[in-house]
Amino acid sequence: MLLHIPGVFTRDEVGRIREALEQADWADGKITAGYQSAKAKHNLQLPEGHPLAQEIGAAMLDRLWQNPLFMSAALPHKVFPPLINCYTAGGSFDFHIDNAVRQPKGSPERVRTDLSSTLFFSDPEDYEGGELEIQDTFGLQRVKLPAGDMVLYPGTSLHKVNPVTRGARYASFFWTQSLVREDSQRALLFEMDGAIQELTRDVPDHPSLVRLTGTYHNLLRRWVEV
């Protein structure tokens, strides 16, 4: 399942974030790549623990934990602290699959990467190239969203970032360990939750709503890992 989550940050917020990122000191993006990924990764990144990355990441997570679409689709259990990157001057990241488990620097906590997310801080017209290409059971998707919007997709997906040939592409990326490990099960629960919400709005007193909601929670109880 690939999902577009619009408006995580407002236009004004994105403008302030981008202005701060343009003044930041960047490091080689290979610092957080695995052995194979490092061969394919050609970008810049704020180091883990950088104060600006922590500030932006905390604001992102605060918004996402209050975002019904993210909560319904991801069913989050743990989140790897968001990282910030920049692609410019031909920067790219060839096809790869993210590491299955990530461990934040200086933390004993491990996060299984069930879901990957990219939140854009640059508008599509700000740069040439830089499309996020995601290959999975839903086919090949090319993603280039407005600043402030986010894409959520399975961590098992083969994906890449095309070379940026003009301008700069600023974004944040992170991983989520879901309460439900299997993508097809999460997708089923997401569709069912959406149907329940629509029925609650359209026919709030329908007696079948109680049974349908009960079925949702029984499936969640069967599949959840805590």
UniProtKB/Swiss-Prot annotation:
Protein's GO biological process: DNA damage response; intracellular iron ion homeostasis
Alphabetic keyword roster: Dioxygenase, Iron, Metal-binding, Oxidoreductase, Vitamin C
PROSITE patterns: FE2OG_OXY
EC number(s) given by UniProt: 1.14.11.-
Superkingdom of source: Bacteria
NCBIfam families in UniProt: PRK05467.1-3, PRK05467.1-4
Protein name: PKHD-type hydroxylase PFL_0865
Native species: Pseudomonas fluorescens (strain ATCC BAA-477 / NRRL B-23932 / Pf-5)
Lineage of producing organism: Bacteria, Pseudomonadati, Pseudomonadota, Gammaproteobacteria, Pseudomonadales
